[in-house]
Amino acid sequence: MNKQKGMTLLEVLVALAIFSLAGLTLLQTTAQQARNAGMMKEKMLASWLADNQQVRLHLNKLWPEKSATGALVTYAGEEWYLSWQGVDTEFSQLRALDIEVRRHKQDTAAIFSLRSYVVHE
């Protein structure tokens, strides 16, 4: 009797199915990581913008107005919308400063929010 050498068609198809599933899983994972990297970059840039605005307002020694103020800025080659507003605290000499960063003025959710406090001199 001759002994067969090699693999049967069924064995080849099973191996092919296993490798294709592994490839699809790897592709999905890579796509998810690419999406997350983009979101992380956007959040990082937004946090830098909020920090810069906070420092700018503190250096100018401005008492934050209670009305919302906003500005369209270009940063890292992209346009962003910054808004900031003073919020009263229980102490009259202390006011909270809320800064929010959005991609567009009409966006409902901020990409990044920052709260700091300003003492009235």
Curated annotation (Swiss-Prot):
Residues 1-6 form a propeptide. InterPro entries: N_methyl_site (IPR012902), Pilin-like (IPR045584), T2SS_GspI_C (IPR003413), T2SS_protein-GspI (IPR010052). Disulfide bonds: none annotated. Gene3D superfamilies: GSPII I/J protein-like (3.30.1300.30). It is found in: Cell inner membrane. It is a single-pass membrane protein. Component of the type II secretion system required for the energy-dependent secretion of extracellular factors such as proteases and toxins from the periplasm. Part of the pseudopilus tip complex that is critical for the recognition and binding of secretion substrates. This is Type II secretion system protein I. It comes from Klebsiella michiganensis (strain ATCC 8724 / DSM 4798 / JCM 20051 / NBRC 3318 / NRRL B-199 / KCTC 1686 / BUCSAV 143 / CCM 1901).
